[in-house]
Amino acid sequence: MTLVGKLVHISIDLVLVSTCLAGIKRNTGLTPKLETLDNQTMRNYMKRYLNLGESVYDYSVATCGSSTYFARK
């Protein structure tokens, strides 16, 4: 696998993990404690990372909600 292929693969994996964390937040209210991070820059990047997951989660729910293949119960 080329370097570009590996980067794409890792990027997609990171987005999936972030989306999973967003789903956990929505369903249980549990979120990572970002206050435990000492580095302010790292804390800001983690907030952005988690917000990306929230956006992907929202988009996925909206797409599935408007699809004929899914129904709400």
From Swiss-Prot:
Entry GO MF terms: lipid binding
Top-level taxon of the source organism: Eukaryota
Keyword Mitochondrion among UniProt keywords: yes
Keywords of the record: Autophagy, Mitochondrion, Vacuole
Disruption phenotype: Lacks mitochondrial fission anf impairs engulfment of mitochondria by the phagophore even if it does not affect the recognition by the mitophagy machinery as cargo. Does not affect reticulophagy, pexophagy, nor the Cvt pathway that delivers the precursor form of the hydrolase aminopeptidase I to the vacuole.
Database matches in Pfam families: Mitofissin
GO biological process per UniProt: mitochondrial fission; mitophagy
Function (record text): Mitochondrial fission factor that acts directly on lipid membranes to drive mitochondrial fission required for mitophagy. Directly binds to lipid membranes and brings about lipid membrane fragility to facilitate membrane fission and engulfment of mitochondria by the phagophore.
PANTHER family per UniProt: CHROMOSOME 16, WHOLE GENOME SHOTGUN SEQUENCE, DUF1748-DOMAIN-CONTAINING PROTEIN
Protein name: Mitofissin
Taxonomic placement: Eukaryota, Fungi, Dikarya, Ascomycota, Saccharomycotina
